[in-house]
Curated annotation (Swiss-Prot):
Protein name: Cytochrome P450 monooxygenase 253
Encoding gene (name): CYP253
Membrane topology of this protein: Multi-pass membrane protein
Cofactor needs: heme
Subcellular location: Membrane
Record-linked InterPro entries: Cyt_P450, Cyt_P450_E_grp-I, Cyt_P450_sf, Cytochrome_P450_fung
Gene Ontology MF term list: heme binding; iron ion binding; monooxygenase activity; oxidoreductase activity, acting on paired donors, with incorporation or reduction of molecular oxygen
Residues of the signal peptide: none
Database matches in Gene3D superfamilies: Cytochrome P450
Length: 526
């Protein structure tokens, strides 16, 4: 996010008038002077790198800023401060600091910076990830948790098992298109959980594509500096005939609301007929009055789960494919565990999950090794705070460096290696890592903003990964001399919503000759 701010700022400067540049400089100067006066009068912020006058540290951040954050951690410690054009920023880099602030002081550290375009105009204040810490956020969060907690997530398991069978069948038919199959499976699985839709037949399904485009639009709108209204909030009150950006944003909100409410109406009709399967939306409708939610709020809460959930799950499955290509010994060990329990007459199911500790550890390692959200969405302090002698003023942006915490050598020795055994003791029992909410990593976030869909996501990753390991070998292609052509360990791309491996080649081959017949039989008997 900060790196995109740099690109946005450069583009705006290049296209702005001299008067606009002078106005921006004056505003930034006033903000910086005010921030310094207030900060120095109350205490000293954590140390950090020296920046430029007015602009601070924004030009010191590369395209993938978590790498630079991790370097600064070594220089300045687990908590350091930055200046983004007058806005104070604090970056948290250790489990201890995150636990002290985002967990134990969550009432101060659970708010969001104001996203006028993304959080107010485009979404009407109903996108939970951008919603400020207040009454609306609490009721959306409570309703979402009721439909996605550990117990509630179990009712989606039959749908997820069906999706895993379809993923395996599609992978068998077109192994070279494995990435497209992963994207289809991720989108279809979350759509089934949210709306009880039948399996999607292609990765670019029209409805899911519309939701994906909405999520990308929101991510772009949330980038600092993307819209001038974020710097001058009074511009939000301009009439639409004077502000094209506002007019277009409101029109997008109208269209997206119409789409989501249409999905809501379809579920409501099936519920009225008595012919419906369990889904997140059905549960939200059943508890709508109790939770004090409007039709529009339920529609947006459900609809936006698809975009966020599909992208992150597909990216994590891509990380799994990369890891298996690079670490064949890990793949073979997981396959041996599956074979010993499941055999070749059936696919793994959720009933096998408690008896597949190494596969479960492998899922954790996928999420730790290359987190698809290395820093997440910034938070904002809602009041002044002091921590270990440092002053953190109200309105400070707070960034949790998930990348650094998942690679803390004190917790994860040889952190750059893909090693599921790190989550198991000598007897094969799960090791609890403090401060991770039983996950073994911090990829799902912290405190009151921890990902509410993590249980559904963990289920989807487990059943898809177990099915793929049961059916296939995933290997590096070989050159003319038979030498494996290994993909890059570090070539990743930031797609706005997720951080995922750059396109790479791998070879997907069936582990047994009659797997197609077995899959057809399993699907027929399901």
């Amino acid at each position: 996010m900060p790196a995109s701010f740099l690109a946005s700022l450069r583009a705006w400067i290049a296209s702005s008038t001299i008067g606009q540049r002078i106005l921006l400089a004056l505003a930034l100067g006033l903000l910086l002077i005010t921030a310094r006066v207030i900060s120095k009068s109350k205490g000293t912020m954590p140390p950090g790198p020296r920046g430029l006058p007015l602009l601070g540290n924004i030009f010191q951040l590369p395209k993938l800023p978590w790498y630079r954050f991790t370097e600064w951690k070594e220089e300045f410690g687990p908590i350091f401060s930055l200046n983004f054009a007058g806005t104070p920023v604090v970056v948290l880099n250790s489990h201890e600091v995150v636990g002290d602030l985002l967990e134990r002081k969550s009432t101060i550290y659970s708010d969001r910076p104001r996203f006028i375009m993304a959080g107010e105009i485009l979404t009407g204040g109903m996108l939970i990830v951008f919603t400020g810490y207040g009454k609306v956020w609490r009721k959306l969060r409570r309703a979402g948790q009721e439909g996605l907690n550990v117990r509630a997530s179990e009712k989606y398991q039959p749908l997820q098992e069906s999706e895993a069978r379809l993923l395996t069948t599609n992978m068998l038919r077109e192994p070279a298109e494995w990435d497209a199959h992963l994207q289809r499976a991720a989108a279809s699985s979350i759509a089934s959980a949210v709306y009880a839709w039948p399996p999607l037949t292609k990765s670019d399904d029209g409805l899911v594509h519309r939701i994906d485009e909405l999520m990308r639009r929101l991510v772009m709108a949330g980038l600092p500096g993307r819209y001038l209204v974020e710097i001058f909030p009074i511009m939000k009150h301009l009439p639409t005939w004077m502000a094209k950006w506002k007019r277009e944003g409101l029109e997008w909100h109208r269209r997206d609301t119409e789409m989501f409410e249409g999905f809501y109406d379809n579920v409501a009709r099936f519920m009225a007929s008595g012919k419906y399967k369990p889904s997140l939306t059905a549960g939200l409708i059943e508890r709508q009055e109790k939770n004090g939610l409007s039709k529009k709020e339920v529609s947006w809460l459900a609809g936006t789960m698809i975009g966020a959930g599909a992208e992150t799950t597909a990216a994590s499955l891509s990380v799994f494919m990369l890891a298996m290509t690079l670490y064949p010994d890990v793949m073979r060990k997981a396959q041996a565990e599956i074979d010993a329990l499941v055999g070749r007459e059936r696919m793994p199911t959720f009933a096998d999950r408690p008896h597949l500790p190494y596969v479960c550890a492998l899922v954790k390692e996928v999420l730790r090794w290359r987190p698809v959200g290395p820093v997440g969405v910034p938070r904002r302090t809602s009041e002044d705070d002091w921590y270990k002698g440092y002053f953190i003023p109200k309105g400070t942006l707070v960034i949790a460096n998930v990348w650094a915490m998942n690679r803390d050598p004190a917790i994860y020795p040889d952190y750059d290696e893909f090693r599921p055994d790190r989550f198991l003791d000598a007897s094969g029992n799960e090791i609890d890592i403090a401060g991770t909410h039983g996950q073994g990593h911090v990829t799902y976030g912290f405190g009151r903003r921890i990902c509410i869909g993590m249980h559904v996501a963990n289920q989807a990753l487990f059943i898809d990964i177990a099915a793929l390991l049961w059916a296939f070998n995933i290997e590096a292609p070989t050159g003319p001399d038979g030498t494996p052509i290994l993909p890059s360990r570090t070539d990743f791309v930031d797609e706005g919503l997720v951080f995922r491996p750059a396109a790479f080649r791998c070879k997907v081959t069936p582990r047994i000759d009659d797997v197609a017949t077995m899959l057809a039989t399993l699907e027929k008997n399901a």
